Swiss-Prot record:
This protein's pathway: Cofactor biosynthesis; ubiquinone biosynthesis
GO cellular component terms, semicolon-separated: plasma membrane
Main location: membrane
Required cofactor(s): Mg(2+)
InterPro entries from the UniProt entry: HB_polyprenyltransferase-like, Prenyltransferase, UbiA_prenyltransferase, UbiA_prenylTrfase_CS, UbiA_sf
Protein name: 4-hydroxybenzoate octaprenyltransferase
Catalysed conversion reaction: all-trans-octaprenyl diphosphate + 4-hydroxybenzoate = 4-hydroxy-3-(all-trans-octaprenyl)benzoate + diphosphate
Organism (species): Neisseria meningitidis serogroup A / serotype 4A (strain DSM 15465 / Z2491)
Function: Catalyzes the prenylation of para-hydroxybenzoate (PHB) with an all-trans polyprenyl group. Mediates the second step in the final reaction sequence of ubiquinone-8 (UQ-8) biosynthesis, which is the condensation of the polyisoprenoid side chain with PHB, generating the first membrane-bound Q intermediate 3-octaprenyl-4-hydroxybenzoate.
Top class in the EC scheme: transferase
Segments passing through the bilayer: 28-48, 51-71, 102-122, 124-144, 151-171, 174-194, 212-232, 233-253, 274-294
């Protein structure tokens, strides 16, 4: 195909728009979804996850995160133009139609559903509330005072699904990990919301940063503390090897550094602090990986 032909240029433009809607150039959301899923897969499989299951969850996570981003932009299409961070998104620039976004969301969900084929029926069943949470979260910002808590539920459903896929049932430690991840998500997404707080107050969007008001930093650190405490409880429940426990002082240091950073409440610093949570996910994955290795 001639790269200068009208058809090629049209297809290239549509592909660019769709990839931007999917946040394909911003993998942080996929990583923050993958870390707790990987924690669960490694714990449930004693450190040796089946490659087909691992691939299914990895690809499925990317696809569902992408679908969530598209439906999020659809839901926020009337607000994104008024927010500094989102004013250049496709809807805000008038580069995409509502029908296109809905069809792209449906297509991505269909592809994600195909990833369930090699998994058991319990995993299929648990994917239904996961799908519901992922697709409805963006609309909670209109009426729910802490939508980040709802997002925490959506971002944590990979955990019981992973246990269901590997063990055939959801063990108690899965729910401890689930609760821990809800708190972690609430912490880092509140920091994310702090970056947009002034804009959200003007347009009337509800976020945890708005709801917590001047106690937003205290709320973030309480959630971080609860997350780390529950990870310690998880370690006790599974009889974690010594390597697991080395994560706690490292994570506490990373959390303190986040506290020191967000005290300024500067928009860019809050956004960079949100991104830094990828390190916490990586540290805990390394600790769980080491636990499964040394516990054998």
């Amino acid at each position: 195909m001639n790269p200068k032909s009208p058809l090629f240029l049209r297809l290239s433009d549509r592909l660019d728009v769709y990839l931007r809607l999917m946040r394909a150039d911003k993998p942080i959301g996929t990583l923050l979804l993958l870390w707790p899923t990987y924690w669960a897969l490694w714990l449930a499989s004693d450190g040796i996850p089946d490659l087909a299951v691992l691939a299914a969850f990895t690809i499925g996570t990317f696809l569902m995160r992408s679908a969530g981003c598209v439906i999020n932009d659809f839901a926020d299409r009337d607000f994104d133009g008024a927010v500094e961070r989102t004013k250049n998104r496709p809807f805000a620039q008038g580069r995409v139609k509502k029908k296109e976004a809905l069809l792209l969301t449906a297509f991505l969900c269909l592809l994600a559903a195909l990833c369930l084929i090699p998994l058991n029926h319990l995993t299929w069943l648990m994917s239904l509330p996961a799908l519901f949470l992922a697709l409805t979260y963006p609309f909670t910002k209109r009426f729910f005072p802490i939508p980040q808590l709802y997002l925490g539920l959506a971002f944590s459903f990979g955990i019981p699904m992973a246990f269901a896929a590997v063990a055939g049932n959801v063990l108690p430690q899965a729910w401890i990990l689930f609760a821990a991840n809800v708190l972690w998500t609430l912490a880092y997404d509140t920091v994310y919301a702090m970056a947009d707080k002034e804009d959200d107050l003007k347009i009337g969007i509800k976020t945890s940063a708005v709801t917590f008001g001047r106690y937003d930093i205290a709320a973030v650190m309480l959630c971080h503390g609860g997350f780390t405490l529950l990870m310690a409880v998880l370690g006790a429940v599974i009889g974690a090897a010594w390597a697991y426990w080395t994560a706690i002082p490292i994570v506490l240091l990373l959390q303190y550094r986040q506290y020191a950073a967000i005290k300024s409440r500067v928009r860019q610093i809050c956004f960079e602090t949100f991104l830094a949570n990828n390190r916490i996910g990586w540290v805990w994955f390394t600790a769980i990986f080491a636990h499964t290795f040394f516990a054998k």
